[in-house]
């Protein structure tokens, strides 16, 4: 019997119902500690590149003056360092939330403290996300660099070269998605193998995902309906705020977005954790035993 997507999703919802504290509360803490906090910090820091771009579009200022005033080395360096720290912090928190959800999917009764698991192995957590970012970028450059060259030449060669450049950009985007799916299980391997290095986890993820990238992509698409429904509901709630003014629209939209994310996030991540357990271990760990699928041999076990 092969991977059963509806069953994996049903088990994720069942795990959410039986986990205490409720995953929605833990997800709320995660969202407050990660996206909300980092967005607040980012809003307090001036983006010199963004400001430079806006002033250039205005065409009322001399570019040399803009560079001298806005792109001050100290300001640029401070902005880049802060953005780097924010990115690393988001990676570490994402590692912790993945740890929490994997434990939830396995009925291990995780708690809020599992959100900090990334800080307990900060070197491995940071390195795995860094390597994934580097590898994904390098693979994308295989098409982006030729696309950039073709775009420059197309200024002299006509629309056909521009069309070719567009195809190369699309190919780069598709390749980036494929590469991202190759590495989707790397964090799970680190969580299951405390002695495994980041590069080894990425290698194991690539091997495990052979023949499974399409299945995981379809699983991700299966949540699209919920996202569309949420978008409609958020728009409806926001329209009700028109009665009270634009401030109410923003507040109601944020509340609707947050409420939906609190439910959908652990649901999606829990389903992915079940996908990992099936592909790598050949069963869903939420069950006390392998059940009727006990005889199934994971394709990954052949490696």
Give the label of every model feature segment:
Residues 1-303:
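Hydrophobic alpha-helical membrane segments
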């Amino acid at each position: 019997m092969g991977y059963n997507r509806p069953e994996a999703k049903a088990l994720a919802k069942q795990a959410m119902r039986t986990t205490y504290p409720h995953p929605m509360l833990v997800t709320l803490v995660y969202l407050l500690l990660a996206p909300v906090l980092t967005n607040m910090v980012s809003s307090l820091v001036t983006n010199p590149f963004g400001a430079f771009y806006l002033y250039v579009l205005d065409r009322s200022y001399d570019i040399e003056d803009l560079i001298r005033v806005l792109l001050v080395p100290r300001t640029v360096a401070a902005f880049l360092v802060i953005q780097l720290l924010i990115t690393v912090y988001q990676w570490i928190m994402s590692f912790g939330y993945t740890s929490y959800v994997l434990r939830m999917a396995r009925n291990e009764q995780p708690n809020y403290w599992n959100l900090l698991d990334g800080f307990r192995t900060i070197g491995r957590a940071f390195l795995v996300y860094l390597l994934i970012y580097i590898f994904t970028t390098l693979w994308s450059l295989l098409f982006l660099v030729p696309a950039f060259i073709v775009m420059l030449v197309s200024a002299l060669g006509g629309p056909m070269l521009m069309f070719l450049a567009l195809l190369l950009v699309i190919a780069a985007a598709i390749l980036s998605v494929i590469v991202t799916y190759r590495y989707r299980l790397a964090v799970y391997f680190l969580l299951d193998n405390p002695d495994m290095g980041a590069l080894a986890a990425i290698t194991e993820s690539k091997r495990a995902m052979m023949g499974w990238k399409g299945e995981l992509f379809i699983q991700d698409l299966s949540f699209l309906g919920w996202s569309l429904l949420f978008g409609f509901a958020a728009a409806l709630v926001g329209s009700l705020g028109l009665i009270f003014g634009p401030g109410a629209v923003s507040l109601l939209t944020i509340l609707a977005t947050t409420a939906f994310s609190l439910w959908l996030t652990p649901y999606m991540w829990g389903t992915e954790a079940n996908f990992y357990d099936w592909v790598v271990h050949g069963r869903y760990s939420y069950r006390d035993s392998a059940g009727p699928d006990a005889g199934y041999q994971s394709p990954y076990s052949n490696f």
